[in-house]
Amino acid sequence: MSFRSSSTSPRSNKQTATKRFKQSGQAQSVGSPKRHSVKRKNNEQSKKSLSLAERKIIIFNKPYDTLSQFTDGEGRKTLADFIPVKEVYAAGRLDRDSEGLMVLTNDGILQAKLTQPKSKSPKTYWVQVEGAPTEAQLEPLRRGVELKDGLTLPAQVEIIQDPQLWERNPPVRFRAAIPTTWLAITIIEGRNRQVRRMTAHIGFPTLRLVRYSMGGMTLQDLQPGEWKEISLPS
């Protein structure tokens, strides 16, 4: 990817390559059994009848301060401000104050594969934290940390060089006397604000969070607000 630099990580002596992070339970509705059965049958039929020609997969670089949904009653930026394609839905969410890769599709099977916990689909985030954690301080994340909603599964965590990202608008607020560090964190869960809570748990608050990859798909060279339609093998 070709990006403009916004800040420099003090851990530039770490030579870990970010390339290694290119990753090559259904809810039951409440109601009458008959209606549930018909709905389930229709959903299964629509999935089976979706051909490769009909399948749409879109990758999108979500800008900061954008909601990961198509509608909003409060006038905030949404996916509809950037993506004109109809009948595609986000596979998972990305916080309003986070940036990076979102996958949108009309393929229910792919959507489930990317989002359901049992699929254990990897998601990699580039995370700028306040401070300079040591390998020993990062080790709890690799083992799992106890958050309010339970113990996290082990994560892959590495210190990386500044990934040379685009400038964020608004800029990240830094404290001049405190260094920052970039981490690549890969998880196979999708709890609310999980990565931010994980880094805060070990004493290094997240300043900036960018999702780089999801289920083997990456940001490629997309700039904030850009999207493209891609195809995947059947």
UniProtKB/Swiss-Prot annotation:
Q: Name one GO molecular function term.
A: 23S rRNA pseudouridine(2457) synthase activity
Q: Which InterPro entries match?
A: PsdUridine_s_RsuA/RluB/E/F_cat (IPR042092), PsdUridine_synth_cat_dom_sf (IPR020103), PsdUridine_synth_RsuA/RluA (IPR006145), PsdUridine_synth_RsuA/RluB/E/F (IPR000748), PsdUridine_synth_RsuA/RluB_CS (IPR018496), RsuA_PseudoU_synthase (IPR050343), TruA/RsuA/RluB/E/F_N (IPR020094)
- Kindly identify the residues recorded as the active site: 95
User: Which reactions fall under this protein's catalytic activity?
Assistant: uridine(2457) in 23S rRNA = pseudouridine(2457) in 23S rRNA
- Composition bias, kind Low complexity: at what positions? 1-12
Query: What's any GO biological process attached to this entry?
Result: rRNA processing
Is the keyword rRNA processing in the record?
Answer: yes
Pfam short name (any one) = PseudoU_synth_2
Region listing for Disordered, in residue ranges: 1-49
Catalytic activity, EC: 5.4.99.20
Leading EC class: isomerase
Q: Which CDD domains does this chain map to?
A: PseudoU_synth_RluE
Indicate yes or no for the key word Membrane. no
**Gene3D superfamilies assigned to the protein according to its UniProt record, in alphabetical order:** Alpha-L RNA-binding motif (3.30.70.1560), Pseudouridine synthase I, catalytic domain, N-terminal subdomain (3.30.70.580)
Keywords in alphabetical order:
Isomerase, rRNA processing
Provide the function of this protein: Responsible for synthesis of pseudouridine from uracil-2457 in 23S ribosomal RNA.
Q: Which protein family is named in the record? A: Belongs to the pseudouridine synthase RsuA family.
Q: What is this protein called?
A: Ribosomal large subunit pseudouridine synthase E
Species name for this entry? Vibrio vulnificus (strain CMCP6)
Gene that produces this protein: rluE
